[in-house]
Amino acid sequence: MKVAVLGAAGGIGQALALLLKTQLPSGSELSLYDIAPVTPGVAVDLSHIPTEVKIKGFAGEDATPALEGANVVLISAGVARKPGMDRSDLFNINAGIVRNLVEQVAKTCPKSLIGIITNPVNTTVAIAAEVLKKAGVYDKNRLFGVTTLDVIRSNTFVAELKGKKPQEIEVPVIGGHSGVTILPLLSQIPGVNFTDGELAALTKRIQNAGTEVVEAKAGGGSATLSMGQAAARLGLSLVRGLQGESDVVECAYVEGDGKYARFFAQPVRLGKNGVEERLNIGELSDFEQKALEGMLDVLRKDIELGEKFINN
């Protein structure tokens, strides 16, 4: 099993690479790519960790050597959000980076499962899909927007509020991966109930958690370590699915039946072809239903922005 991390010298990429080096199954290969010249050194550094995961690093303009034979490709390349930046500022830089890297994936390992971490995910996943389509290799079961960070944040914040163990809480999060498009289904946690006030405050905290980190880091970065953990969790689940493990379920931003929007974060069962099954989002509370209806315009516009970036 070979996993490639593109953007491996960045804050998310290094954290993700460390977690994969320590947690991928024995005999796996990990390849790191970044434009930054330090990348082969990051691989050497990680190679000293005693696990049976072979690691190699590649720098420069061409990601091809890192991508050859990859089963899973995780893309975290791009600029991070700084205080005062909004998503459109990010988009202007990151859209081109994602396009360029996905073009190389389409050429070199078109059958790989692709996880997009680079923000704004609502839009960059649409860009990736259109690039793959143009190359004639798009398979909607093999492209994922990584929204796992919303899930792990929800698990943490619910556990804190209710005095539970975070590892025993699993909150499905649907919609998208920014602001109001992030919708934690707090009504679906067995044995946990919330007041209306708690629901509103908790939902808002989960939606704005990225900004919480950006502000706390005071200009020194965005959420890199928790995002690395979230991306590792999804990446390892993709690997487990490819290896034939049954009942591997994660929430991810995928192209579905278009009921709400072309791309939508929902629980999916993973397997040898990526998404084996898109699972029902279940019954929503009135609060959740209203939030879902209220976000769809924003989500659809985010998606359209990505489609137009490639097709215009």
UniProtKB/Swiss-Prot annotation:
The keyword Transit peptide does not apply. GO terms for cellular component: cytoplasm. GO terms for molecular function: L-malate dehydrogenase (NAD+) activity. SUPFAM superfamilies: LDH C-terminal domain-like, NAD(P)-binding Rossmann-fold domains. It holds the Pfam family Ldh_1_N. GO terms for biological process: malate metabolic process; tricarboxylic acid cycle. PROSITE patterns: MDH. Keywords: NAD, Oxidoreductase, Tricarboxylic acid cycle. Its EC number is 1.1.1.37. Substrate binds at residues 81, 87, 119, 153. It comes from the Bacteria. NAD(+) binds at residues 7-13, 34, 94, 117-119, 227. It catalyses: (S)-malate + NAD(+) = oxaloacetate + NADH + H(+). The keyword Cytoplasm does not apply. The active site is at 177 (proton acceptor). Belongs to the LDH/MDH superfamily. MDH type 1 family. HAMAP family: Malate_dehydrog_1 (MF_01516). Catalyzes the reversible oxidation of malate to oxaloacetate. Homodimer. NCBIfam families: MDH_euk_gproteo (TIGR01772). This is Malate dehydrogenase. The lineage of its organism: Bacteria, Pseudomonadati, Pseudomonadota, Gammaproteobacteria, Enterobacterales.
